[in-house]
């Protein structure tokens, strides 16, 4: 018989069916993120309604998110953003460092509207909740390489291993490089448009 796949979300900090949650939430799976060519948090606006995200002009790996028109475009640590970012259950207190790379992703949930009851005062616009994969407690390697124009190379590696009877270790690495159209005559080479190295260890 035909059936409808149940979508589980953790918008209220517990696993529930998306049909039972009284919150406007967009839940994205790994497959949806990959099909949408979502590379980092900022790209999620392609798949979620009433959401805009853009780079912070003053760096810091920051991103300004706007949900239903509510946003805060600053990295100042003494001011809280109007849209909160939660990474693996940990709340990011400012916009700095929130434009994460999403190559090691388990799920994404975008909650629209005030979420202060569960997430605190600086979530009047909503919350972007990002969950990365956890150790599988089994030996395994996932490796992927993409080569594109402009000398773009994107190498991704995830390694899992068991530790003892109940523990696990996960190591994830990514190396992304891409040339710019600008040529540096002093160094006789093209400037790098993107040059990213990311690593994480979870146990």
Language model features with spans:
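Intrinsic disorder/low-complexity segments
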Residues: 1-2, 199
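Acidic, small-polar-rich N-terminal luminal/periplasmic segments of exported/outer-membrane proteins
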Residues: 2-138
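Outer-membrane beta-barrel translocator/receptor signature
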Residues: 82, 94, 103-112, 117-199
């Amino acid at each position: 018989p035909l059936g409808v796949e149940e979508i589980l979300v953790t918008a209220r900090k517990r696993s529930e069916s998306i049909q039972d949650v009284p919150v406007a939430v967009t839940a994205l799976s790994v497959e949806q993120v990959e099909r949408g060519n979502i590379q980092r948090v900022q790209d999620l606006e392609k798949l979620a309604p009433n959401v805009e995200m853009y780079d912070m002009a003053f760096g810091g790996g920051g991103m300004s998110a706007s949900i239903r028109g509510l946003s805060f475009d600053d990295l100042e640590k003494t001011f809280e953003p109007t849209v909160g970012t939660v990474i693996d259950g940990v709340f990011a207190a400012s916009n700095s460092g929130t434009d994460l790379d999403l190559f090691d992703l388990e799920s994404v949930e975008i909650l629209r509207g005030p979420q202060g009851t569960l997430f605190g005062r600086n979530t009047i616009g909503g919350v972007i909740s990002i969950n990365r994969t956890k150790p599988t407690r089994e030996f395994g390697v996932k490796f992927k390489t993409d080569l594109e124009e402009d000398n773009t190379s994107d190498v991704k590696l995830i390694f899992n291993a068991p530790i003892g009877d109940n523990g696990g270790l996960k190591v994830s690495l990514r190396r992304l490089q891409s040339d710019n159209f600008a040529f540096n005559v002093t160094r006789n080479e093209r400037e790098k448009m993107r040059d990213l190295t990311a690593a994480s260890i979870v146990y």
